[in-house]
């Protein structure tokens, strides 16, 4: 953990150094007034069937699951978030957000904390972020507390981004606006994402809205006899163990029409062998392609495709201990209806295990469908109803969980999302 405090401390000192000259001239209300704070409380009720949720140590794909084949009902404060977003000047601002999530391993934990810079209005603009942040991947999250915008549960793609792809980064972006279109390039170097790939390999894909935190950890399902002597039963996604910096890059194109597309590349450059407390850095690389289009005045389409590879362990004559290719995609349609918004989404996901399948089979494939309706009750409250069904095949369920490889789950949720 020393690496976390050292890196975070250096980042905080750098941020304060940049912000200090402008703090004195900033309006107090812009830094400490009501407009400098945001908050969200999510009151949740749900009914779910099928296998035990992965959050409770099973192989279930959803936030909630059944119990011994029976459906279970839940009512809880699913999350409570507070964000401080000081505006030091036109060019310089910040964001610090903390969260409490039901079942979170730490009571209250850090969500994001970064300093932002933007240049003045011009055809070519520059911006930068430095601190703890999610890379610009998800088309489904927005806001100072990184909330899902159209549904309760994000896609498999962005569920994974939320649980394993948070970083401590220095990010820069250049954007040029032409007469009828915009082109932007983003690049960053980062640390503190050495464990990305652990959940994806040993649990597989999932669909849920639980986000990783700086000091938190997630449980893993039952591990095989060949893996359990070397892998802890938990994973700490934000750990930094190998001292290596990774990178990511993105290109965005806002076309002349109501369509935007982007392409993203990520490589954490993990060394695969520097084990600490039975957790080893993974070498995880992936691409993400995204698109968004307005289909008339009231309908929006979103899509993402993510594919890559993750590795852990030394080279052996028989391959690398964990070597999996992964891919997932979704298509989402959202339309304004009856004063609210109805959203339908289809998901597909797959994991292909390239090594030691006889002793540790991490193959998986599946699909999911989601239907949600979001209705504003007041300026500060939204009601959301969501029905989600997922079917998946994972052979490890038979050998490690004593259940059938093919499983399906259905989850009905209602959310009262309060903002302040």
Where are these regions (language model features)?
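Positively charged n-region of N-terminal signal peptides that target proteins for export
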Residues: 1-4
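Bacterial N-terminal signal peptides
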Residues: 8-20
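Outer-membrane beta-barrel biogenesis signature
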Residues: 20-71, 193-224, 237, 381
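Outer membrane beta-barrel
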Residues: 34-37, 42-50, 69-205, 252-256, ...
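Extracytoplasmic loops and strand-loop junctions of Gram-negative outer membrane beta-barrel proteins
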Residues: 62-67, 97-98, 151-156, 229-236, ...
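Short sequence motifs at beta-strands and strand-loop junctions characteristic
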Residues: 69-77, 105-109, 159-166, 239-243, ...
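Outer-membrane beta-barrel pore domains
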Residues: 114-117, 141, 258-420
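Signature for the C-terminal beta-barrel architecture of outer-membrane proteins
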Residues: 118-128, 163-331
């Amino acid at each position: 953990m020393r690496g976390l405090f050292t890196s975070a401390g250096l980042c905080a000192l750098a941020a304060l150094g940049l912000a200090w000259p402008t703090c004195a001239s900033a309006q107090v209300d812009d830094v400490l007034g009501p407009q400098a704070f945001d908050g969200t409380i999510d009151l949740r009720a749900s009914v779910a069937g099928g296998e035990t949720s992965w959050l409770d140590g099973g192989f279930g794909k959803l936030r909630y699951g059944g119990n011994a084949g029976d459906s279970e009902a839940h009512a809880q404060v699913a999350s409570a978030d507070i964000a401080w977003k000081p505006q030091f000047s036109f060019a310089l601002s910040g964001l610090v957000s903390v969260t409490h999530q039901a079942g979170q391993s730490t009571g209250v934990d850090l969500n994001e904390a970064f300093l932002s810079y933007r240049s003045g209005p011009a055809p070519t603009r520059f911006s930068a972020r430095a601190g703890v942040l999610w890379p610009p991947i998800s088309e489904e999250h927005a806001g100072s507390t990184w909330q899902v915008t159209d549904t309760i549960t994000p896609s498999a793609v962005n569920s994974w981004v939320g649980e394993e792809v948070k970083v401590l980064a220095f990010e820069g972006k250049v954007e040029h606006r032409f007469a009828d279109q915009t082109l932007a390039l983003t690049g960053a170097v980062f640390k503190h994402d050495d464990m990305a790939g652990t959940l994806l390999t040993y649990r597989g894909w999932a669909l849920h809205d639980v986000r990783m935190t700086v000091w938190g950890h997630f449980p893993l399902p039952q591990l095989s006899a060949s893996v359990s002597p070397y892998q802890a039963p938990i994973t700490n996604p934000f750990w930094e163990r190998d001292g290596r910096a990774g990178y990511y890059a993105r290109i965005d194109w806002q076309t002349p029409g109501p369509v935007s597309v982007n392409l993203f590349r990520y490589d954490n450059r993990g060394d695969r062998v520097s084990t600490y407390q039975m957790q080893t850095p993974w070498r995880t690389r992936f691409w993400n392609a995204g698109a968004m289009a307005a289909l008339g005045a009231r309908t929006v389409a979103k899509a993402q495709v993510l594919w890559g590879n993750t590795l852990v362990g030394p080279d052996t004559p028989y391959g690398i201990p964990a070597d999996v290719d992964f891919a997932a995609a979704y298509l989402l349609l959202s339309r304004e209806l009856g004063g609210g918004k109805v959203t339908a989404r289809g998901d597909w996901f797959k994991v292909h295990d390239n090594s030691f399948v006889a002793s540790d089979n991490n193959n998986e494939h599946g699909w999911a469908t989601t239907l949600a309706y979001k209705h504003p009750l007041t300026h500060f409250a939204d009601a959301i109803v969501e029905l989600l069904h997922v079917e998946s095949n994972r052979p490890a369920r038979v050998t490690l969980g004593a259940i059938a490889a093919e499983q399906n789950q259905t989850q009905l949720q209602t959310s009262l999302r309060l903002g302040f």
